[in-house]
């Protein structure tokens, strides 16, 4: 029987850390508990090991399983990958058994291209959000998958803000962000020598390869050596349907703990930003608000978070 390399969150559980990695096992456990987790799937640590055995290639069997599970995600979400009617956008994250610095950063909004961004801009009536997602995706993919430094894109953002006489990214308009997306693609082409990928499957396989590659980057190797983590473990990959924190001031992103990390006290702790996406909280671009303020700004969401945390 063929090896199973991919698991829906609903197919796993919290005891499967060796196979699904820490993040994948916990997402599966939260799904089993009925928590409101955006659905997706985990590509196993065994797929990572196989990738290295195959000369750093994702073989046809694993690719076929990944695309089979994209189809299952499409059934769950009612959206389709690369579709021009109701497109599915995903995030891609690494997830080793043990938390490790130096592993691949997150890629958000994967599945966007020139055509799809136009569709979501029109359908949502929110072109600023659509082009914000697109420019972020180009920036993340270029940095994380193709190793084009973040600084080149940050410089273009700073130039655009100076041109518009604003200081915050959130003050840039839909037109500004559309222009930036074009500049980002030109920057990508000048650095890589080819056009930014438009095929969602190509984007997805590129992102998954980048996660597997990051298992053996210099920082990860040094960390493993210092902490007696075997190189044979490999890392899992989590592909999850997007939840958007950057659709407006009634949306947000944040980090939360169900206990005080310093004392262990049973108290919800964390911070959040409105109209932002994941990396904004830790990037230091804007100052996050303490999670207690969420009770005033978004009482329903706060109550749901409080209930879930118990």
Regions found by a protein language model. Name each.
Residues 1-309:
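Nucleotide/phosphate-binding sheet-loop regions of phosphoryl- and nucleotidyl-transfer enzymes
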